[in-house]
Amino acid sequence: HPQFLAKLFFQEVPEIFEGVIEVKSVARDPGSRAKISVHTEDSTIDPVGACVGMRGSRVQAVVNELQGEKIDIVTWSDNQATFLANALAPAEVSKIFLYEEKNKVEVVIPDEQLSLAIGRKGQNVKLASNLTNLEIDILTEEEESERRQIEFKEKSSLLTEVLDVEDVIAQLLVTEGYVSVDSIASETLENIEKIEGFDNDLA
């Protein structure tokens, strides 16, 4: 049970026992690996360092109690993106796209970090998901770049077709953030003329 892990830290870390450090969430794959997020309002205290202890003594006592279960201790944050990046450690995160209404996030990571982010049998991403209470989709930088190119082509070909303009003009418009006919129709002539490569006649 996740609360069992929190209780062990409560026993081993005086700052948790005293209420100076708070255990915010726990995610476990019992017997294998766990993640725990901690937070303190006291800026002079490093909550992760306090839980690890001198030379790892505190966390090691908890690990021994759990027969060698690996434990990641991460800093909790009320900023979802920061907390998520911490939760996915040891993998590095390049970008995070939040879809707040769905409790879902898309995380972009360097290509070579993919196996680290997902973990053995999906363990790292699963624990990070449970810890943050978010559904996590992981993309590599290459996959994200390919997707953006496809989206760019789709948007520019739509404008080419609807506005009956050349490809290069449609691409210019999409690059400037005009991704729909409505967004162009509602824009002033003056602003469209400002786009590099556009003149009064073209606009």
Where are these regions (language model features)?
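RNA-contacting regions in translation and RNA-metabolism proteins
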Residues: 1-203
